[in-house]
């Protein structure tokens, strides 16, 4: 399974979604634009998407949920260790109030992994983010040893994806 992402204006991305209703397309609002995500076993219908292989998942994507996309940079010599660490995280995410879905994504190009956490709303996510589970497994401090010394990669950061009707 692959997850493809592309950013643009609400109108442009919504037209893509309307023209391809047979596809698994999900549109969200960010602080400064809109984003469309496509989950697919094959090629994307998006023209120039960022492409990721889904290497771990729980739950289903839903446009009515709040998502946090965490961008985790790494270097070639740390990729396997980062991936192994994240795949070995064995935590009961479903036990967190409001939890809906999780995706661990490996880039098809580049060296920045993504982690998507889906929750019923931002408050439920913030509660999870304050937990020991998050801080010990997904925080910048927990993952910084896998970033590598190279300055060629991006930095660890989060981007919030809001349901269109809520933002």
UniProtKB/Swiss-Prot annotation:
Subcellular location: Membrane
Gene3D superfamilies, per database record: 3.30.70.100
Chain positions with Phosphohistidine modification: 65, 78, 153
Name of the molecule in the record: Signal transduction protein TRAP
Source species of the chain: Staphylococcus epidermidis (strain ATCC 12228 / FDA PCI 1200)
Coiled-coil stretches: none
Family matches, as PROSITE patterns: ABM (PS51725)
Family per similarity comment: Belongs to the TRAP family.
Gene of this entry: traP
All residue ranges annotated as the ABM domain in the record: 66-157
Keyword terms: Membrane, Phosphoprotein
Additional detail: Down-expressed in ATCC 12228 compared with ATCC 35984.
Record's comment on post-translational modification: RIP inhibits TRAP phosphorylation.
One GO location term (cellular component): membrane
Principal location listed in the UniProt entry: membrane
